[in-house]
Every structure is written in C-alpha cells, then in structure tokens.
C-alpha cells in the first residue's frame, strides 16, 4: 500500500490530468493506427483511475468516455472540450476521474511518470495478492505507456531527448520482469535497500540470489528526473544556476514516506 502523502496526492491528480490530455489527442487523430493506440492507452489509464476511485474498472463507462472523445470535434478548442468532458464524466458517474486542476505543465508529466513508477513498485511488492502472470502483464503495459510519453510532450527538443533516453526506464522495468520470471521458476525475490545494478555484473551473488531494490522504480524515476534537469542546461547552452539542487533518495523517500 502506497502511503497517502501530500506529494502522492498531487501525483494522483496529475495522473488524472495526464489522462484527460491523452483523450484530448484522440479527437485530433487522423490515423486509424494512432487512434487505436491512444484508445488502448487511455482505456488502461481510466480503468486504473476507476480502480483507485471506485474499486472497479467501470468498463462500460470508460468505453463510453473513450468513444465520446474519439467522436468529439477536432475543431473544438481545449476549453470547450474540458467543459464537455466535465459534463460527460458527470453523466457517466465518473466524477472522481475529473482532475482538481486543469493547469497542464511539465510537472503534470513528471508527476504521472513518478506515479506510474510507484504503482509498479507497489504491484511488485504486493504480488502475492494477485499473481505473477498478472503483474508481468501489467509491466508490459507500463512499458508501452512510458515508451509513448513523447506523444504528449509539447516541446520538440524534449520529445527528441526523451526518445533517446527513455530506454533507461524501460530497462529497469525489464529487470523487474526478469526478477519475477526467476521467482516464477523457483528463485524468490530478495528485496534490498540499495541499488544493485552497479555491482550486478561483477557480483555473482546478486544475480543468483535474485535481489531487487525495494522501491526500485521510484528510485529510477527520481534518478531519471535529475538527469533530465541536469542535461537541460547543456541543451540550452547555459551554465547551471549556482544554487541548483538535485533531489536525493533520502529526501524523496521522506516526501513519499517510503520505508
């Protein structure tokens, strides 16, 4: 269970806004393939949102919401689409899927990535409440979500950079898949508090004992966020500010009350 901290509450609301902006892309799509891809992702996001809010995926209602978004006029401005979205979610009894704020920034995207990372960690740590196969399937879907974040980035330079470095996140999701697969065939996962990949290549024990960092994806998303913030000064050809600070793992764990 993820502790309900102010930061995690912000992440959840950003996730709802991210989901809204994703279905906004549906009405502008002119490609059948893209529409199908966006619909699949939006359906997953809203199923999960409903699971959080209603303890049920609300399959029919989410399907109606997605179909409505697909058929909405591409000429409608975002403000009008927001008004009609509020009306539609109210009509479908999906009010809890309405974001508290519609102010969309880069923070919205970062919060959503951190949120999904925490969800992955929670699914892995509580895997005994479902099944390994179920968690493995969720991880495959999560990889697609992270892979396609560039769809919603409204900065060309940011999109290009994300396309180059997103493999860092996906690589770590696949490390979790490998650990789960080992457990499936008899080698239980041992959770440790430190990041293991630096020594995994040289330490046979790390590999053979199937060790996995607890809260790995939270750590990875924090590290990735720090890297992007570091690299933007190179992209802008500017000197970093004198008092520029990076998030530390200790501070991040405190903000999220992670054990």
From Swiss-Prot:
Places the protein is found: Host cytoplasm; Host nucleus
Role description: Functional FAD-linked sulfhydryl oxidase that is required for infectious budded virion (BV) production and for the formation of enveloped occluded virion (ODV).
The enzyme's E.C. designation: 1.8.3.2
Lineage: Viruses, Viruses incertae sedis, Naldaviricetes, Lefavirales, Baculoviridae
Protein name, as recorded: FAD-linked sulfhydryl oxidase
Source species: Autographa californica nuclear polyhedrosis virus
Reaction catalyzed: 2 R'C(R)SH + O2 = R'C(R)S-S(R)CR' + H2O2
Gene Ontology cellular component terms for the protein in this record: host cell cytoplasm; host cell nucleus
Subunit and interaction comment: Homodimer.
Keyword Disulfide bond found: no
Keywords of the record: Early protein, Host cytoplasm, Host nucleus, Oxidoreductase
Single GO molecular function: thiol oxidase activity
Major location category of this protein: host cell
